Amino acid sequence: MLEKNYDAASIEQKIAKRWEARGAFKAGMGAKSGTEPFCVMLPPPNVTGSLHMGHALNTTIQDIVVRFERMRGKNVLWQPGMDHAGIATQTVVERQLAECQEPTRQEMGRERFVERIWEWRHETGGVIANQLRRLGVSCDWSRERFTMDEGLSHAVREVFVTLYKQGLIYKDKRLVNWDPKLLTAISDLEVEQREIKGHLWHFRYPLEGKVFDPGDPTTFITVATTRPETMLGDTGIAVNPEDDRYKNLIGQSALLPLVGRRLLIVADGYADPSEGSGAVKITPAHDFNDFEVGKRNNLRLINVFTQKAEIFLHKNEAFFDGLTLSDELKKLVENLDQADRFIARHQIVSLMEEGGYLAAVDDHPHTVPHGDRSGVPIEPFLTDQWYVCAEQLAKPAVEAVRQGRTQFVPDSWKKTYFNWMENIQPWCISRQLWWGHQIPAWYGPDGMVFVEKSEEEALAAAFSHYGEEVELTRDQDVLDTWFSSALWPFSTLGWPNKTTELDTFYPTSLSVTGFDIIFFWVARMMMMGLHFMGEVPFPTVYVHALVRDQKGAKMSKSKGNIIDPLELIDQYSADSLRFTLAVMAAQGRDVKLDPSRIAGYRNFATKLWNATRFAKINGVKHNPAFKPEKVKLALNRWILTELSKTVSAVTTGIENYKFNESADALYRFIWNTLCDWYLELLKPVFQSFNEEAKNEAQACTAWVLDEVYKLLHPFMPHMTEELWCLTETPNMQRKDMLALAQWPEITFLDEAAAADINWLIDVITEIRSVRFEMNIPAGKLAPLVIVEAGEITRERIQRYGALLKKLARIETIDFSDRVLAVSAQMVLGEAIFCLPLGQLIDLEAERARLVKNVSKIEQDIEKISVKLNNPKFVENAKPEIVEAERNKILELRVAQKKISIALERLV
């Protein structure tokens, strides 16, 4: 027997253990013989990570599809795993060492420190895997992979060496995002833009050959900068070729204040005549845009920072090249060398002001890139790094999408993909860390590089090159975490070995991802998959939206509006959270997550639980001989027709990745059709002495509930699995767990029965609505008079009159040729249904009540209208407040209309 209350917390834990004990999610479980494979790769979360709402949405969507395809009998593999998360993991362990007062990373040395990280990984790393289990994800956990596992590391080395020998990996000196606290290059995804209240300094740069006079604009050119500390590396000034103010200066030179370096004035479209003075100082070694301008105009690159973002002047040959070492320059070097960049900023501004070079200072709020791990401003930094020639690898990846071999859902994301791929830059793949895949490159005594899969192979290559044994030094850098992630669809299946899994499951079937990693992960999987496997890694990329708070704001720690999915699971259940996310996962629309919605879908789960209890109390049980096509009762034929439509809607919705439409169809059918109407209409049947009708109703209800559990299972797996178990009967043993049951396939259709029962529901609904609007006491039975009833209506009243009386609180049903005075009239089909109000309520009292209500509503509408017609309110109030007021006035107008209709009925 089912408990009175559904205890989600204990049941979800119990069901999770059952799935695991059964091995329900292992690759191929439940697959029909000879069926096609279906494979999804779980985007590997960081081993340091904790479940957030983005994970919850992403994995819920994947799990819906995976459970659906598993129930359809496909050979399913949902491959889970963890990312080693280079920077994040190294930072976590270093912080732990400091907290425990253990030796630092540097004191430990590389080998011991890496061992320490592995210890942390085995002891506490990977918490998120257990958190994902709480959500109910049906991955094959027995195949869990880790990007630092030996098998995946082998694949990484194979790819690196192959690309290097094909000329697609090389070393180069370019600008990178440099974190001066962590002392490593970082990816764009590890950079967050923060708004700061900064300044814009306008400087006068003297023109060569002119005597500088701050009061004479013909002796200088004005440039502006938010970063005075970088001016020491200036090598040019750019002006727009169409800017008449500077055409005569193009090709001439200015002098860098304080330093004396000649700066060529070049014509370049990067300079915007409408911005500031229209002239831009160019620092190619410290700004990404300037780097490109410098390349186009052959300007020198002068790095004036150390790796710690301190000023680097002493022994900086590039800085001194072409300069006369005056006493002033010596003093400048002495004062600024090794100064922190922000201290140097203030010193340089002071020196510029003293020399008359400071023209103006403006307050200038602007965004500054910060390292998301270190929290410090990152620097565009000129350094030697390893790169992948992404441009060449991107071409076939772009073509594959153009040809439709890989499609994006929604299709609009294709444009974003093309924009990124067609403007792709070399991919910096080296990181100055100890944790990660160490680059398989060794250097000889003369710096000659040997790239091989192992040290033994590198030594052999060196011997062949030098003709003798030499000592090699391995490259200290590790690979960007995204490098190993890019191989995920085939490295996890055993590549470069030829395995059965690789042959069966590559290419995979679907990639589900957030839009923020289309470039970082999806595009790179496309490039690597095509290059090494000769085929796209997946035919479909489903891009889900962002989960925002209930007001539509992006979640962030600074705003204090982060919603913890684990807290929601504790409070409402995993199933309720999953269903909420599915309902709100409309394509291309961000999810505004309101906890009250989750509470509502918890009630939805309770509704089905109670419906099952009601069914069992009323003797509902399985009949092995039950066949839908043999059903006789119109009520049962109607529910089977509605169920068939729901099966089609849910199936089509999941197939087309319209999860909200599937969830909506399920909600309407379960809450309204099944619980509110079918079970309600069955009560007289259950209570009757007609054993044949009762038996059919009991068997049909049991069969329909089973199909409902199956349909709802991908969305609410825990509760449906429990109900599947609890509704097993001795004469109907379950063949297996619900997770491995067959997906519903029903094409039952009885339009006549559907028309009859839907008519009955419409009549009851209309009468109930009028009773509520007219304030008719719930206990008072009402007479019903039907005017102009045709043959169909009379036949239906004859068949369903008893049900109508019971459910609509009707005392008598009569037919008439004329409409009664002072009656509520409802037109349904060809007939008019009348409730004579004079016999039911005090007309004058009811009229007074309604007039009072409508007057109050009109006053409220007037108040809100005044607000909304005030431009200052609309412009200055928060958008969500304005939207709330607009919604309120719409609700009031709906209520106003309903009361007006009720008043008309009293005339």
From Swiss-Prot:
Family: Belongs to the class-I aminoacyl-tRNA synthetase family. ValS type 1 subfamily.
Documented EC number(s): 6.1.1.9
UniProt feature coiled coil, ranges: 838-870
Keyword Hydrolase annotated: no
Classification via PROSITE patterns: AA_TRNA_LIGASE_I
Motif ('KMSKS' region): 554-558
Native species: Bartonella quintana (strain Toulouse)
Protein name as it appears in the record: Valine--tRNA ligase
Domain of life (superkingdom): Bacteria
Hydrolase found in the keyword field: no
Any single GO CC term annotated in Swiss-Prot or TrEMBL for this entry: cytosol
Main subcellular localisation: cytoplasm
GO molecular function: aminoacyl-tRNA deacylase activity; ATP binding; valine-tRNA ligase activity
Locations listed in the record: Cytoplasm
The protein's enzyme class: ligase
Cited Pfam families: Anticodon_1, tRNA-synt_1, Val_tRNA-synt_C
Subunit (UniProt): Monomer.
UniProt cross-references to InterPro entries, sorted A to Z: aa-tRNA-synth_I_CS, aa-tRNA-synth_Ia, Anticodon_Ia_Val, M/V/L/I-tRNA-synth_anticd-bd, Rossmann-like_a/b/a_fold, tRNA-bd_arm, tRNAsynth_Ia_anticodon-bd, Val-tRNA_synth_C_sf
Intervals of motif 'HIGH' region: 45-55
CDD domains in UniProt: Anticodon_Ia_Val, ValRS_core
